[in-house]
């Protein structure tokens, strides 16, 4: 027997022994507790952006997704653009139209990258202090940021996941309950791969009386609720709103954060500390919050859990590209409506400046027409695949002040995409001006409200400096 064969046999024996041990421990200590102690890495390749949102739903997992900001989608493996065609279109005349429409979107995207780069090179001249590599990377990132709205939600990507056995079980149960063929097929592939390394943790996923009942519960509840809820909202026109609306906050929230900060340094009951906070002057409360936040040297220095005492709920209308970035903040409470075309689309100024406006709008129109046709023909679940990322989607984000500090400071940093920078700048202003929590907003000292022309410039300079030190 050769060396590699011996290694594989030894590995298999090791897994079988571990599986036997886990099975015994599971029976003695309980499934859920033990399933938190083992983890696995998994790579999902060639999955649509619709599917990535399902994969990235769980809070207690780690994800790494291929970026549309830095990686151009210009290669054609096997002669086809990288997007997913829904299986339920097989045999339908709409399939050919779907392919033609998405091919046009990708053709337009790829064809305009050189022209948009040339436009930005003429608008933003290279500094003598920057290397050719830094300048080239900055211009390329700016062009891809501008054009990513042409990419459809069907665009495929690669996602890396890490999670415990318990987290993967929860993810797979949700995926098997989904109506989309792509999601369920991916779940089956994931289950097969994961059983190579953690079979005991996933034993009940496809057992009819265990995971099967769970899956039926998810699927049946979704269908029943949609049928019950639809009459209440169907046909109701959306009232006009801004891109960011603070729909929920506690007028006494800032006062309660002060009380929570005092609580940890006292031996007093919660309600008594709150009464003390009410008796403080606004200046005294602001000074106490400044002391609690401390001398923050960078955005990673965050105050303690007292900031979790008050929360903010934002209703957001943003392009799907920006939503994809903000949705990754999964520890807060976030949900979204189906992606469609009824809310219109964003149109970067550089598109018109570079002469691409007519083709941009043609792609938008074709995407909307295909989406509407898919809805009319009964492909409601698959219709979002046809929508390009410039179209806007409505979602809400509800987070406590500590989470808001993290999200808003991170997503307004100069290297961020202009779309989500603007969204988070509006959130920060709403906390101060609408909620009136000016002292809390003031502790978010690394929120950047500046207008940045070349978003990646400082970041690329920093990266080059780091590389030169190795």
Residue ranges with predicted function:
Residues 1-470:
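A conserved ligand/cofactor-binding region detector
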């Amino acid at each position: 027997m050769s060396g590699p064969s011996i290694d594989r046999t030894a590995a298999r024996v090791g897994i079988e022994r571990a599986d036997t041990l886990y099975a015994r421990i599971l029976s003695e200590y309980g499934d859920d507790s033990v399933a938190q102690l083992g983890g696995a890495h998994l790579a999902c390749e060639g999955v649509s952006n619709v599917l990535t949102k399902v994969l990235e739903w769980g809070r207690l997992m780690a994800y790494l997704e291929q970026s549309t900001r830095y990686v151009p989608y210009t290669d054609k493996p096997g002669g086809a653009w990288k997007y997913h065609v829904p299986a339920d279109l097989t045999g339908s005349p709409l399939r050919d139209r779907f392919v033609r429409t998405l091919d046009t979107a990708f053709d337009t995207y790829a064809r305009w990258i050189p022209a948009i780069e040339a436009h930005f090179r003429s608008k933003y001249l290279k500094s003598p202090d920057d290397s050719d590599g830094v300048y080239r990377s900055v211009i390329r990132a700016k062009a891809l940021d501008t054009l990513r709205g042409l990419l459809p939600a069907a665009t495929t990507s690669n996602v890396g996941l890490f999670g415990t056995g318990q987290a993967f079980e929860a993810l797979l149960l949700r995926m098997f309950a989904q109506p989309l063929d792509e999601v369920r097929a991916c779940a089956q592939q994931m289950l097969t791969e994961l059983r190579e390394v953690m079979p005991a943790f996933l034993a009940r996923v496809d057992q009819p009386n265990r995971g099967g009942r769970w899956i039926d519960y998810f699927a049946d509840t979704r269908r029943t609720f949609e049928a019950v809820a639809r009459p209440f909202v169907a046909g109701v026109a959306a009232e006009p709103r801004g891109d960011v609306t603070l729909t929920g906050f506690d007028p006494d929230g800032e006062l309660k954060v002060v009380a929570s900060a005092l609580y940890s340094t006292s031996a007093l009951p919660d309600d008594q500390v709150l009464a003390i906070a009410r008796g403080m002057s606004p200046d005294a409360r602001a000074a106490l919050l400044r002391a609690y936040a401390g001398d923050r040297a960078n955005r990673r220095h965050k105050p303690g859990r007292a900031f979790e005492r008050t929360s903010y709920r934002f209703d957001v209308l943003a392009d799907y590209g920006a939503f994809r970035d903000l949705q990754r903040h999964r520890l807060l409470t976030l949900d979204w409506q189906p992606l469609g075309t009824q809310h219109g689309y964003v149109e970067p100024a550089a598109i018109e400046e570079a002469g691409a406006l007519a083709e941009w709008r043609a792609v938008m129109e074709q995407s909307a027409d295909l989406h509407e046709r898919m809805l009319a023909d009964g492909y409601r679940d698959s219709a979002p695949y046809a929508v390009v990322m410039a179209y806007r989607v409505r979602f809400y984000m509800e987070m406590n002040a500590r989470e808001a500090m993290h999200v808003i400071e991170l997503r307004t940093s100069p290297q961020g995409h202009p779309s989500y920078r603007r969204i988070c700048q509006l959130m920060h202003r709403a906390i101060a001006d609408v909620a009136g929590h000016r002292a809390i907003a003031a502790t978010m000292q690394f929120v950047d409200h500046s207008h940045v022309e070349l978003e990646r410039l400082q970041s690329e300079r920093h990266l080059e400096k780091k590389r030169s030190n190795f």
